[in-house]
């Protein structure tokens, strides 16, 4: 996705592929070089999350991302004890470990580590996309926080 010029706020959540190579990245060498070059050239930051005991998204995989992206890779690891202990059946029976930080294993409580991760992702996206929107919008266009006039609304 980061090869796509429109992707300006890359977030990697529990990347688990390839399944048979815990330290591998599911990307060709050519694409990996292009991603690393783009991230460096454009000053992008890549935000990533995983649980510490995740057997599908391992520390080896995060290390591979760090090797590829250097300091632009912000890999954050949550303690597996913070995961929702009652995930949906697929995650309980097939995945079998804390894996999906902001979905199946999210604990919807203020201040909880998984909610903090979710809030960090939202803040990252808002900051990155807000910066882009400021650069892209014309001076006569409303800000995102301003109501957008509806040209189809009838006059009062």
Where are these regions (language model features)?
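Primarily recognizes the serine-hydrolase "nucleophile elbow" in alpha/beta-hydrolase
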Residues: 1-26
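The feature captures the conserved acid-bearing segment of alpha/beta-hydrolase catalytic domains
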Residues: 18-79
